[in-house]
Every structure is written in C-alpha cells, then in structure tokens.
C-alpha cells in the first residue's frame, strides 16, 4: 500500500556557509501495517485492519495521530508517559504526543486505551 503526502512546504536551512533547500511534508496519510515517523505534524491512519506507528525521537518532536482503524503507537526509546510500552487507540481516536528529554508524553487524546 502507498503513503500519501500533501504538497510539501519548502524550507531553507542555513548551516555554516551552506544553504540547503528541503521539501518538508507536514501531513501524511498512512495505509500500511507499520510506519516510523519522519517529522510529520499530523498522521492519518486508514485503509488497513491494524497499524503500528513507531515514534522516532530522532526525527519527530511533536505529532498528532488520527486513526480511522485500530492503531498501536510505540516509542523508539523509553516508555510513553513514563509508564507505557505502547498505547492502543481505536477507530476514530486522535492523540497528540510530544518528546521531552527523551520521553514521549501524551498531551491530549480522545479514545486512548492504555493496555
């Protein structure tokens, strides 16, 4: 299955004496069984029975995940909210997470089931 991205936002990054232009995708529609974050602001999960999203703290600091299917969210290191190895969210739920000092925290959610 494919990954659909919205039109990219163009970024110019200045580092030392170099200028690098990047295309930055902020919204992503995922219809795969597994996906690892790449710095998106919003991921919408749909068109699969179950999906697993891995939060990559090297590329992503803050993210919202809206799911139209069952979804399991796992961190790349540590635990979510210092307690959970993973969180499971059901169809129609939305959760916002932020990485602070290497720990992923749930900032807001609807329909989060902490199993």
Predicted regions and their residues:
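A conserved acidic, glycine/proline-rich C-terminal tail/linker
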Residues: 78-87
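Exposed extracellular interaction/assembly regions and N-terminal maturation sites
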Residues: 2-77, 99-115
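Extracellular disulfide-bonded cysteine-rich modules/repeats
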Residues: 90-101
